[in-house]
């Protein structure tokens, strides 16, 4: 009987500077550590990505972690162009930025600079959405939407997914603050973002 290989936990890297990873992968939030070993998932199209790392036996766990944030990526390839993992296709819809309701209020200036490096056309944006009160609520990708709006991009791609109730509550609060599209998101300094957004989240979840 083959002994099962031990795998340490998978940790996602959330910073934009780390010499172990390419800048492109860091900007896409595709950088992971398993123990001390780096693993990369690089998005190469609206549906495909390349995975790299020391141990191919760990690829599937990295992919599962990555797809928590990017379930529209359904085909994963290694550097030799071998298919590692595939999932059922996710239907994408083309939608006007003006018709997207944020579930966020602020944009971090540091994250905005990083995102600006890879957002150039509508093809670069795929946003997770939920339907609520006849609105298309963005679950994630608010910085990308803000950057796209500033660059004059009028449409993006999205897919409908599931989300916890807090996303709808956050969207309702955004509406109360007159943030009814990505055009009204407020850019703030990094230290202010951490203070304002984290304080709001802490207060919200402490009351649950």
Residue ranges and their predicted role:
Residues 2, 6-139, 149:
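Short alpha-helix boundary/capping and kink motifs at helix termini
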